[in-house]
């Protein structure tokens, strides 16, 4: 065994001081000293359990001891009588075996393949034992779940990712999917449950048993987000539901995930074979599937963006040439050819890599380099994580951890280790780039003329002449030269390394050539240089613009068209990644796909990392806003569609924020116990105003109210029990906090909750019954007007139906025409006095007479006035479709309804485009005179004369 290096021998003295009396220095072997010096996790564990160290010394870990895990664990669980005891024994067993694995790994007593096998088998053993114990307990409580033939139905668990592949790392969360075979009901219990209820409750308890931190720690962090529909989907699915989902809706990334899926425990049973046979056609196509290459290119881009987004330069998993890229290389061949080549259908990476070499899909040399690099990186990753049982893949910056890793990896010092590491990662990156290169090699652009380089590098004065700017007017030319000079002065104030200078000197002549070809060269250049000032110290982004000419062209055209986009890109340079693919840049996500795209985006972030989750939500929103604005500028989205996209995006965000808040609240307090008798969460979010009316703009805030249906006597079922209604209040407060927290990527949305019953003085969250009572007995007419533009944007079907019924009932109340007309008109006059135009000789598109608010008041008045006679008027919450309904129900002439619709969309279109120009919502007094006259005439007809 290699002796400890000098820094570690010094650290050993610190370790000795921590050791209790029974672990005196003289009683320890050289092996024990080495492991205790290397791993704080082992050190802490044997201090708490000295008998484990005795066991390690007398019975050192063996390569095949994973075969005994199940028997050892059964013995530990033999006297467990309740769930608390189960949780304690599982946690202690996991810790004891992890100490043995860390010992074997640190001292290199077994191969790295054996370590991966032991880690994976330990996880499987713990998962299966917990499942089987809970299944028996749940059957005693609720009866045994059976199919129509009375056959008992098991819970099958798919282990995904590295767990499925038998390649789990030392400190890893586990990705699981739960399934059961057939529908039916429980038999033999005190009360009958259908199988879906039984397995959902059991699944929740299983996650709690494995995941919930106690004084003994946790077993594994459980991640269920890979299941169909992610967090918004059922926790457990029947085989039929799984099959429907993967056949009808399965995405490419879900195919990649399913390659490694493995059934935990008894995998040879009838149901296990049925599940495997059902999933195989989805994962492995019968033909050679080259269609997957474009998806893989997209994923390659996603990896590169991930590295940039999170600054993962020292990350041995996600960085260039890291573990993820080796996994990716192997999956390329599995997904393209796996359907035809059974040898490529292995879940484990190394056997698949051997099969790839045997089929001559990679050269023997490349395959061997990847194999050696993979084992090197996995050993380094596992050693790094075993120091503190910490889930990290980032190389350390502190000297002690570096010394530990260099010693354990058998290097003299850290520079030696990083030298070999760099060589391995370079080999991986080379194969990765060769395998998934772009369709066409980039044509080498002809070198720019010397004059463009002179313009950038020679700092010409305002009165200098240069032929390349001769086509510009004198003023424009002077402005361009001044902007270049100012930009260079800004650069002098910043610390830019040699590589950054080199990239900038390559980029700027190209950029100036493209910008100065435009008539608005000075304005465009001023916006782009402001952006560049923010990113000059981040060479990665400069390289992106330098290496992808198409991205540079998109940047120039978007900044020229919209200062809003330019300032967004300047504030959040991560968005520059969106410029790489024009197919997505000018094609916003399908309106019904925002939730799924966001779910996929959030999968890359640990569920328990609130800070990263908040960042990811904001980054996703900004990227989608950019794509919507780009399509708007390009003219591919009409105004109605712009608002549709902005509204669907907001709803996806609300969905994700509620999910995040719910998970946090349930972890803290448990769930309100009235939910045990029903599906769902007993919670709804109602959107008012522009959100409710599908009319959001680029900078709109969200008008929200929160409802629940929690009984007065409900309590939560967690260890920190609180009143059920208090739970929903804290949930709503948490949602508001998640929306408004300012991170480096800004806030998510401004949220206004003042439209709730009793306004700012009322409770933040209201029971459904109290809301109905308030609307019937206390609400003012303007609150009923607001209800016209309200709809549930998140919520259970029961609460949604309840809200819709209350809304319909309130809107169809009989109202006296003159009184209503007076109240609506007076409210509008108050608003105009308060919000009307403060700018002389300007027309405020929204607030002034003849503007958008007048049209909204006309539609609201007519719905409240006539819905008693024509209940169909309550169907929609947006102005355009309400105007259609008014015409269809013979309340307004079709010609007037169409004219008001045209005026409304024209004015809204102008507001969108003013927002893109970062201009306020008012225009010259002589604009839109025809539209304003038309609106005034309608106002006079309905709210003055009628």
From Swiss-Prot:
Transmembrane segments annotated in the record for this chain: none
Entry keywords, A to Z: ATP-binding, Magnesium, Multifunctional enzyme, Nucleotide-binding, Nucleotidyltransferase, Transferase
Catalytic activity, EC: 2.7.7.89, 2.7.7.42
Pfam families xref list: GlnD_UR_UTase, GlnE
GO molecular function: [glutamate-ammonia-ligase] adenylyltransferase activity; [glutamine synthetase]-adenylyl-L-tyrosine phosphorylase activity; ATP binding; magnesium ion binding
One annotated Gene Ontology cellular component of this protein: cytosol
Gene responsible for this protein: glnE
Reactions that this protein is recorded to catalyse: [glutamine synthetase]-O(4)-(5'-adenylyl)-L-tyrosine + phosphate = [glutamine synthetase]-L-tyrosine + ADP; [glutamine synthetase]-L-tyrosine + ATP = [glutamine synthetase]-O(4)-(5'-adenylyl)-L-tyrosine + diphosphate
The protein's role, per its UniProt record: Involved in the regulation of glutamine synthetase GlnA, a key enzyme in the process to assimilate ammonia. When cellular nitrogen levels are high, the C-terminal adenylyl transferase (AT) inactivates GlnA by covalent transfer of an adenylyl group from ATP to specific tyrosine residue of GlnA, thus reducing its activity. Conversely, when nitrogen levels are low, the N-terminal adenylyl removase (AR) activates GlnA by removing the adenylyl group by phosphorolysis, increasing its activity.
SUPFAM superfamilies given in the database record: Nucleotidyltransferase, Nucleotidyltransferase substrate binding subunit/domain
Catalytic class of the enzyme: transferase
InterPro entries recorded: GlnE, GlnE_rpt_dom, NT_sf, PII_UdlTrfase/GS_AdlTrfase
Cofactor: Mg(2+)
Stated family: Belongs to the GlnE family.
A GO biological-process term: regulation of glutamine family amino acid metabolic process
Superkingdom of origin: Bacteria
Region annotation (Adenylyl transferase) ranges: 449-946
Protein name: Bifunctional glutamine synthetase adenylyltransferase/adenylyl-removing enzyme
Region (Adenylyl removase): 1-440
